């Protein structure tokens, strides 16, 4: 039976979604792994989103809390708001109380990825505060560490991401798109976490 990896994200302007697409490619590069992209529900009105100049959402399906249980491993992605995950994603986690009560997600590997506007925008604080959500669910947090190799030490270019997970800088006006090195790190994260998820499933079978 194939290992199921879900990539669950929220994206306002497409930066997190672009990383999610690359993470999906990386996870799919691991044999016998099925990967699915999901969005979390939007909580802002169309009026507010319009004033934010947010583009229309893609056709990626919106997930419900109960659907998380179907996955063997989950990679969560979100933009940063004042140093922590966006309210849309926090609202989704807040809706998983039923899963918390039964510990339905306990033992599942989980990773995180993120986007900030600037280099001081909170990439690591967002990761650190997100880990609390995984902890209360009993999930196994899987950071990428320095497994991405030499590019983790690249100082020649602006680069998002960290040992906590893949990341990108959107720029203060959102005009900067994920760079090649950021996309490569996202691919690596998908491949890395899918591989670990597959190993855990095989050993627990």
Swiss-Prot record:
The keyword Zinc-finger does not apply. Optimum pH is 6.5. SUPFAM superfamilies: Flavoproteins. Induction: Up-regulated by 2,6-dimethoxy-p-benzoquinone (DMBQ), 2,6-dimethylbenzoquinone and menadione. Not regulated by host root contact. PROSITE patterns: FLAVODOXIN_LIKE. It comes from the Eukaryota. FMN binds at residues 11-15, 112-165. NAD(P)H:quinone oxidoreductase reducing quinones by a two-electron transfer mechanism. Can use either NADPH or NADH as electron donor. Can use menadione, 5-hydroxy-1,4-naphthoquinone (juglone) and 2,6-dimethoxy-p-benzoquinone (DMBQ) as substrates. Mitigates the toxicity of exogenous quinones in the rhizosphere. Belongs to the WrbA family. This is Quinone-oxidoreductase QR2. It comes from Triphysaria versicolor (Yellow owl's clover). The lineage of its organism: Eukaryota, Viridiplantae, Streptophyta, Embryophyta, Tracheophyta.
